[in-house]
Every structure is written in structure tokens, then in C-alpha cells.
Regions:
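Bacterial N-terminal signal peptides that target proteins for export
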Residues: 2-12
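N-terminal signal peptide c-region/cleavage motif recognized by signal peptidases
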Residues: 20-22
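N-terminal amphipathic alpha-helix/helix-capping segment at the start of soluble metabolic enzymes
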Residues: 25-61
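Active-site mouth loops of central-metabolism enzymes
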Residues: 48-65, 116-128, 172-180
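Structural preference for beta-strand elements that scaffold enzyme active sites
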Residues: 49-51, 77-79, 109-113, 143-147, ...
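Catalytic beta/alpha-barrel core
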Residues: 79-87, 142-156, 172-180
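Active-site-adjacent beta->alpha loops and helix N-cap segments on the catalytic face
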Residues: 86-101, 150-164
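Glycine/small-residue-rich loop that forms an oxyanion/phosphate-binding "nest" at active or ligand-binding sites
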Residues: 112-147
């Protein structure tokens, strides 16, 4: 069962990254044999990659989880679930923590994710505020990949995707439908 989950995660990540790669070559991201290299990790190569979530409520818990991920050779990528933080609405605190996590993780890529209530997360936010929050994060990008919910307002998704590419960050377009 775990192997299937790893493969599904890797395929989803590769497909989303391939679909959303910017037209230019980013400094930290290189196209290599139709795969993407992020912090020296070739996302498309075998073995499949393991994404481990950071699901903390506090900064201290997030730092502790990142330290465990950083020291685990079986963890390839960390996903920072921002919506689970007690201070998720405070963009300055989130950015500062994201920068710390990125340093702790060293060569392991960091995905920044706000999972909204509509898709099984903890944050309830309008399309306008969702875009505004991500724009704030992108002023000082701390992530290598940004998870954008693909069925939010189409204009917001398009604008965010364009900005993410300008900032040389990869996009993961996601959809979580728990009714199917």
C-alpha cells in the first residue's frame, strides 16, 4: 500500500510540474532528460520520491518536524502545510518560518501549501485573499514548489502561476475531491 501511495504522489508531482514549468530555465531548476531537478533532486527519476508533510500548529513543532525530515534519508521532499499553523494568517511569521524550514531541510525541496477548507484543509479564505497571501509569500520565496488549488478563480490561478514562474519557483496545480 505504501509503495502505491509513493508512486501516485510521484506521478502527480511530476505531471503537475511538467505541466506548469516556466518557459525559461530557472537557476535552481533544470530540465534533465524530461525530468526536473530541484535542489539536486531529480523529481522524475526512479526510485520514486517520498513527500513528507510538515503538519505543525506551532513554529517549534514545524522546526522539529523539519529536523526529522532533514535527517531521514528516506524523505525526499517536505510539504509545509501552512493552513495547519495557529498563525497561518500572519504572512510575516509564515515567511520567517518557511525560510527557517528551508535552511533546515538543506538539499531537500520544500513545497508550500495552503489547503483550503473546500479541499480538505483548515483555512477558509476567499479567492482574492488566497491570491493575496501567496503574493506575499512570493515577495520572499522560501519554497521551491508552490501548491496552487487549480479550481480556484481561474484569473487568480493564472496570475499566480505567472508570478510563480517569474520568481523561479515550480507550480503544483492540485485538486482534492473527497466526494469521489
Amino acid at each position: 500500500m505504501m509503495k502505491i501511495k509513493k508512486i501516485a504522489m510521484q506521478l502527480c508531482l511530476s505531471s503537475a510540474v511538467l505541466a506548469a514549468m516556466p518557459a525559461f530555465a530557472a537557476e535552481a531548476v533544470q530540465l534533465s532528460a524530461r525530468h526536473y531537478v530541484v535542489k539536486n533532486l531529480n523529481i522524475g527519476d526512479l526510485p520514486v520520491k517520498t513527500i513528507v508533510p510538515i503538519t505543525a500548529k506551532t513554529a517549534e513543532q514545524a522546526i522539529a518536524q523539519a529536523q526529522v525530515i532533514a535527517s531521514n534519508p528516506n524523505a525526499d521532499v517536505a510539504e509545509f502545510r501552512i493552513d495547519l499553523l495557529e498563525f497561518s494568517a500572519d504572512t510575516k511569521k509564515v515567511i520567517a518560518l518557511g525560510q527557517q524550514l528551508n535552511q533546515i531541510l538543506k538539499e531537500k525541496p520544500l513545497i508550500a501549501t495552503i489547503r483550503t477548507h473546500n479541499e480538505g484543509g483548515k483555512m477558509t479564505v476567499s479567492d482574492q485573499d488566497y491570491e493575496k497571501i501567496y503574493r506575499e509569500y512570493l515577495k520572499k520565496p522560501f519554497m521551491q514548489l508552490l501548491d496552487i488549488e487549480m479550481f480556484r478563480n481561474a484569473g487568480s490561478v493564472a496570475k499566480l502561476t505567472k508570478l510563480v514562474h517569474v520568481k523561479k519557483v515550480l507550480v503544483i496545480l492540485s485538486n482534492h475531491d473527497f466526494s469521489k
